[in-house]
């Protein structure tokens, strides 16, 4: 069993300036957290490390979009209609709860994905009462998780705080496609705040109303979901918990990436590659391999936009296995939906190696109907119809009795006909499919702190890798003699100017100062002592094993650069 301690971790994190409850002097507000000086530095280092993986190494580009979005954009994405949690309320004390969570707490049953009526019946059949006062609970209803606001002083335009960063990438897709010279595949990332008005956020950093995401949207040809670098990761071991094994309750299975792909456990090569990349990132920042597993979404919990989705989960002692990353194949849902709602063609033209003769289904506008109906717009509408996916038009007419073009013009079954035609084509137009790794930065930081804390009875410290530690080196004069203090201050100044996050500490005994630095995860301590004044060398101490070596002052920077990695 993995040995971690939530209470001890959070005690140290609060005490030493990593994480604090927000608005403490006003009794606090659930679902919000402050990052103290060390926490904010750690967070920025992790986000920058993420950029190294996804922007520098993968060659993706980062954009930044507004955190407030208009209602029509989120209507198109499905969030207005589908971004809901099941809620119930106590009839006596009026406290509200997530219905699936209160059932799971009371019965141990996993009920995620069940319909509201089913949850209501379970609450009734099991006699589940309010945890606070024992009162009866109401029927279960859907509660939309988005924060609503009004845009502009007149208050006539509804907006929402964004529930994810992804939509800010999908909406400017036409400009992004042009930037990438109209070629697939390409990747775009965004890091920033997202917002979800959680019903009852009682799990600290695990369930926040304002949280930080790092998301990549990789646009790929639906017919070619491969990855050029798969060979580099094919032997990586993944601890998988596929949907089938969950339903059989048969536990996880360790497989190489190549084995998982060949067995059809993971749906595509590109998705498998990104599971491996996520694991490599987490291990790089210091989360141990045995604390991680990859759980596939069950059919009942699969997001409305996904055909395959895996959560990277981390073990915790207080919350069990928690999701810290979601990696999904979103198919063409987002681009197709935004195309339909906005009237913009968000397809990509993929050129064939040589022209092909094909038979295809074509739409034939009836100008005798469109002319009187749309007058001056008729010719443009006829042209626009020829650019729309014919299957999309036929499906809408069959299922809904109408097709809405460009979000405005209603096309009825009598307005068009369909025919099979033969033509020579030089390429095909497709909606790209999207592979999305979505990282919950706050949960990752919590997981890292939880699994980094060492409390062996003699010392308590965060064993953070040097490249993510918020303070990289502390400089200590052995005693408070002026010559030692001045030399230590000069070394600290030089380290900062050389790109290190360094601090100077002369308060208390040398043992107490080592302990203080260890506790916050400082990997290296430089001690200025009597020998320093004689021969220009300092003691360089390693946090993890307390080993010490003598280093010349002029060699300190290159030595630390090598150790930091």
UniProtKB/Swiss-Prot annotation:
Under SUPFAM superfamilies, the record lists:
Class II aaRS ABD-related, Class II aaRS and biotin synthetases
Q: Pfam families this protein is in?
A: HGTP_anticodon, tRNA-synt_2b
Q: Which PROSITE patterns does the entry mention?
A: AA_TRNA_LIGASE_II (PS50862)
Ribonucleoprotein keyword on record: no
For molecular function, the Gene Ontology terms on record are: ATP binding; glycine-tRNA ligase activity; protein dimerization activity
Q: Per the annotation, which location comes first and is thus the protein's main one?
A: cytoplasm
Q: Which reaction equations make up its catalytic activity?
A: tRNA(Gly) + glycine + ATP = glycyl-tRNA(Gly) + AMP + diphosphate
Which example biological process does GO assign this protein?
Answer: glycyl-tRNA aminoacylation
Give the coiled coil ranges.
Answer: none
Q: Which GO terms describe its cellular component?
A: cytoplasm
Q: Which residues bind ATP?
A: 196-198, 206-211, 323-324, 440-443
Localization = Cytoplasm
Residues engaged in binding substrate: 98, 164, 211-215, 436-440
Which keywords label this protein?
Aminoacyl-tRNA synthetase, ATP-binding, Cytoplasm, Ligase, Nucleotide-binding, Protein biosynthesis
Q: What is its EC number?
A: 6.1.1.14
Origin: domain of life: Archaea
Q: Which HAMAP family match?
A: Gly_tRNA_synth_A
What family is it from? Belongs to the class-II aminoacyl-tRNA synthetase family.
Q: Which NCBIfam families match?
A: glyS_dimeric (TIGR00389), PRK04173.1 (NF003211)
Described purpose of this protein according to its UniProt entry: Catalyzes the attachment of glycine to tRNA(Gly).
Name of the protein in its database record: Glycine--tRNA ligase
Provide the taxonomic classification.
Archaea, Methanobacteriati, Methanobacteriota, Methanomada group, Methanobacteria
The gene for this chain is glyS
